Amino acid sequence: MVKFTADELRAIMDCKHNIRNMSVIAHVDHGKSTLTDSLVAAAGIIAQEVAGDVRMTDTRADEAERGITIKSTGISLYYQMTDEALQSYKGERKGNDYLINLIDSPGHVDFSSEVTAALRITDGALVVVDCIEGVCVQTETVLRQALGERIRPVLTVNKMDRCFLELQVDGEEAYTTFQKVIENANVIMATYEDPLLGDVQVYPEKGTVAFSAGLHGWAFTLSNFAKMYASKFGVDESKMMERLWGENFFDPATKKWTTKNSGNASCKRGFVQFCYEPIKQIIAACMNDQKDKLLAHVTKLGIQMKTEEKDLMGRPLMKRVMQTWLPASSALLEMMIHHLPSPATAQRYRVENLYEGPMDDVYATAIRNCDPEGPLMLYVSKMIPASDKGRFFAFGRVFAGKVSTGMKVRIMGPNYVPGEKKDLYVKNVQRTVIWMGKKQETVEDVPCGNTVALVGLDQYITKNATLTNEKESDAHPIRAMKFSVSPVVRVAVQCKVASDLPKLVEGLKRLAKSDPMVVCSIEESGEHIIAGAGELHLEICLKDLQDDFMGGAEIIKSDPVVSFRETVLDRSVRTVMSKSPNKHNRLYMEARPMEEGLAEAIDEGRIGPRDDPKNRSKILAEEYGWDKDLAKKIWCFGPETTGPNMVVDMCKGVQYLNEIKDSVVAGFQWASKEGALAEENMRGICFEVCDVVLHTDAIHRGGGQIIPTARRVFYASQLTAKPRLLEPVYLVEIQAPENALGGIYSVLNQKRGHVFEEMQRPGTPLYNIKAYLPVVESFGFSSTLRASTSGQAFPQCVFDHWEMMPSDPLEAGSQASTLVSVIRKRKGLKEQMTPLSEFEDKL
């Protein structure tokens, strides 16, 4: 059944101009997996008749059961294009054979880390948008991620069959709906566009927008119709294509094109007249069983149908006719091949985003030229659990060189620093494998520009890594991925039977490997904590942990717990001072809140410890109103050296200051990771070292004296600066009909949420509601919401920002102070906070 073998696939891997690496991205339930099926069917991996129902790329049992994609799945497809299809193709190519490495990614926001992993190893993206629902929150998130990785998008307006069957809209109305959808997508693309990518917006008349119905397996771009009419009427194809979109009207009575509607009954817009109406007529003829009418249309359009197909009725008949006339695969493939870049093109502009080292060394050059003879550069973006329990494939993409079976590679983990031994391994690749949906084919080697799965490296890679040849000791790693969501929801897990503990520890290690986002840690109280992006994400992680990684051993999970952050509201009331244990050193300090937007800038990586100090002080001075000299005196960021807090040196002429800098920084990393209120991370606090008095003898000012003192003085300054708690807040988008709005508002009010935008979707009875909802209140939110709106409302939650809690945690009996004692109790600390007098000393 499969129309190609692994050897054919391997042969074409060398023609880097004939490869397309692309991912399918969209909002949840807009039909990614279903559309992918048509493409898979065209390559002959599944039968055409069942395409759309199999959802080939949903390989896990729970994916099929829930009807959502959870993990991104790769599949390599091989196509032979006809000469006429490639006539207008301008780029370089070798022959007519194309290899498309396609990755189907999840749409659900809890799994957006899977999307990031998929985008990193592809160059183009097919953005799927439901023609009725339009561009939603998640569409925007994934588009922003894609453009951030410099990935060129093409759009398909999916679920066209809804227009014909379910809603029965007329042509003009359909046209305005589609135009709105495309316009909304373009607005997002223009907002996040990158000057190096050029214009990334999509235009139907240029062939970068397709119209599809994934479930029925048909699709078209305007060029399909332009070709058809060009040969029929003998007009120029490109001219015809421009006429099929925009303000172009045709009146069959006068046989003239105009740019305005002349008002005659027969005068219709080009798109409606030549694309929408013919499809509508054929579908109507099929659904109403008007066989003779249908046959007339079919012969006119030159569709060849088998005799037994003519005996079908209703939907199956329509599906066959439409698939034969406008097969989804050819329209979408043509669009991908013409408008998405090959690795050779894409790596030229993506190298700056990918490679951490200097842009003129051997490695950067090899990536830029996509050179198979250069040194190996391979990025592993995720680990895929293999079918035999406990083993993992490392799934990634070769950016330069070749990776082959049995070769020795140098593995650089995410914490690797060039020139050091930390997080570095040299190991053998046992097998190189290419992925074909549910099965894998072993190949000898894989050259650059392709995706690959490697066997035998799973012990050394946690989530992602950079691989190069064993001798290349001066290679820098490829930049780590930025995730658009952060793990804010945590649960504690323990075994039901105490003897299963080793299984749990091992299982947690494997879980951390298999999911790009999840964080597993052990608290000081000995609890095992799993942190994820949301309720659904955690649910899937726990299911994987129990069934796959622990062999079904039972686990007990606590209620979900939310991470908080600690911050300050004002500058410290006074300069606080702490003395070292031997009373010979004194540190003076103040705390103040950071400027608006600065903490977010540090989170996004626009400002950080690795920046050039000149650039950094320029940004701080221009955007946040810092003093230029002050901006050069930032000692460090924290927690984890990159977090959104910092220490600034304000001292004037202090001796020996540099000697204690390291000790103060160490104390700061400790303090910022566990704040004074409830040992949660600090956020958005800027500490200013005002003065330091040190002992002249070096022996009296060692780390043992300074580190604890520094930590105490950080706590004291935090407590004198009106400390507050920050709680994480979700942005919730809800789609619902008008009669469900009352229920939505009441549920949101119970849960301390507030609505900030309500819009009616033009042309539909649905409303789009956006609201903020504290993560603490979000557990069970979707089930409560469905219950009170009788299942008509669908929420999507994305982590959005940190919101300050209004009450004062230092005031007994306030909401914040009860919350603090709850958190402290859970962590096994004293319920009462340590008072300020413990941290601050008097002269």
Curated annotation (Swiss-Prot):
What keywords tag this UniProt record?
Answer: Cytoplasm, Elongation factor, GTP-binding, Hydrolase, Nucleotide-binding, Phosphoprotein, Protein biosynthesis
Q: What's a GO cellular component annotated to this UniProt protein? A: cytosol
Main localization is: cytoplasm
Similarity comment text for this entry: Belongs to the TRAFAC class translation factor GTPase superfamily. Classic translation factor GTPase family. EF-G/EF-2 subfamily.
Role, per record:
Catalyzes the GTP-dependent ribosomal translocation step during translation elongation. During this step, the ribosome changes from the pre-translocational (PRE) to the post-translocational (POST) state as the newly formed A-site-bound peptidyl-tRNA and P-site-bound deacylated tRNA move to the P and E sites, respectively. Catalyzes the coordinated movement of the two tRNA molecules, the mRNA and conformational changes in the ribosome.
Per UniProt, GTP binds at 26-33, 158-161
Q: What are the EC numbers? A: 3.6.5.-
Subcellular location(s) per record = Cytoplasm
Q: Upper taxonomic classification of the species?
A: Eukaryota, Viridiplantae, Streptophyta, Embryophyta, Tracheophyta
Which positions bear Diphthamide?
A: 700
Q: Which GO terms describe its molecular function?
A: GTP binding; GTPase activity; ribosome binding; translation elongation factor activity
User: Residues bearing Phosphothreonine?
Assistant: 57, 59
Every tr-type G domain range: 17-253
In which domain of life is the source organism classified?
Eukaryota
Q: Which organism is it from?
A: Beta vulgaris (Sugar beet)
Concerning Pfam families, the annotation shows: EFG_C (PF00679), EFG_III (PF14492), EFG_IV (PF03764), GTP_EFTU (PF00009), GTP_EFTU_D2 (PF03144)
Could you identify this protein by its name? Elongation factor 2
